[in-house]
Amino acid sequence: MSKSFAEELEMLKAQGLHRRMRRIAGSQGSRAVVDGKEALLLCSNNYLGLADHPRLAEAAIRAVERYGTSSGASRLVSGTMELHALLEERIARFKGTGAALVFNSGYAANSGIIPALVGKGDVVFSDRLNHASIVDGCLLSRATMVRYPHNDTAALRRLMERHETAGRRLLVTDGVFSMDGDMAPLRELAALKREFGALLMVDDAHGTGVLGATGRGSAELQGVMAEIDIHMGTLGKALGSFGAYAAASEDVIDYLANKARSFIFSTSLPPAVLAASLAAVDLVDSPDGAALRERLARNTAFFREGLCAAGFDTMGSETQIVPLFVGGAEETMAFTARLLEAGVFAQGIRPPTVPAGTCRLRCTLMATHAEEDLARAVALMAAIGKGMGVI
């Protein structure tokens, strides 16, 4: 080897790009103990506060008592328990599709679904800011990958015109972009998919449970639920559990069950996770879920308005993901460290997750955040930002 792992690690450290894991003690509530210090948690995807909700915990406990701790096998062997079927039926009803299929994670879903749908001779159109799991799914598929400028539907149209003679065409996008907090223009994308005879897949990991009148996500918010061919979403963010799903027509789901390698060759999700997910979907699809979404929306508006009033650039965020632009990697991580020392944990984001020069704090709001805590966080950020010359 030309370079040792130790040498490469030293290079990452010199570039300000070395990462380490911080230890969280206790549950993922609005406050947590981070590396032994209590802090306001502003970087969890537990948007509705369901990760420590008693209904989910009780459902998981009951499932362990009845079904044990493991599914014991992959889904196509003996690993399909009745809870898998019940959860998939519930997700299909929730998303308004013919069927659904549960995967072990969002990464497993995208890296399995996309190569199952397209291959050599096909083309996949992918937003340049799509999640890494979508990019990897496209690469694994061996289809021609065409990346279009972020949310630029005019540029996308030109690219689709160039590939009209391709085999199967797949248009894939995040519903909510995880690092910027903005949304895909799903109405325009749906029109393009109709015009060019493409399939439209939406990864709504950060919209499911949060957006739309009933929490069905960004497609519901934009009025195009029926236009999406493959709804992908996760169970471990707003829904407070673990895993992911695809929701689509019965034929597409049957096809994925037979072709998606990440589904076929993995031991399936355990009973506790399935039961917690079922409880989460029921809760989201209820008046209690609506109340949580309203609280999250209020917290998000309060926090974003406070940052903007202080002079921060929130990078066009439209959702509960609110980035705070800093710029350089070292400055961003210094900002994070100063905040944590003062009792606020907002994770700095650096390359390769975001392009160089666009490093930011990625703040994520919860329904369970208290307004006074958010006000204190904004004041701290403003003081640190002024001291560092960010604002």
Curated annotation (Swiss-Prot):
Enzymatic class: transferase
InterPro entries recorded: Aminotrans_II_pyridoxalP_BS, Aminotransferase_I/II_large, AON_synthase_class-II, AONS_Archaea/Proteobacteria, AONS_Proteobacteria, PyrdxlP-dep_Trfase, PyrdxlP-dep_Trfase_major, PyrdxlP-dep_Trfase_small
Record keyword Transferase present: yes
Top-level taxonomic group: Bacteria
Pathway: Cofactor biosynthesis; biotin biosynthesis
Biological process according to GO: biotin biosynthetic process
Assembly behavior: Homodimer.
UniProt cross-references to HAMAP family, sorted A to Z: BioF_aminotrans_2
PANTHER family: 8-AMINO-7-OXONONANOATE SYNTHASE, CLASS II AMINOTRANSFERASE/8-AMINO-7-OXONONANOATE SYNTHASE
Protein name: 8-amino-7-oxononanoate synthase
Organism: Geobacter metallireducens (strain ATCC 53774 / DSM 7210 / GS-15)
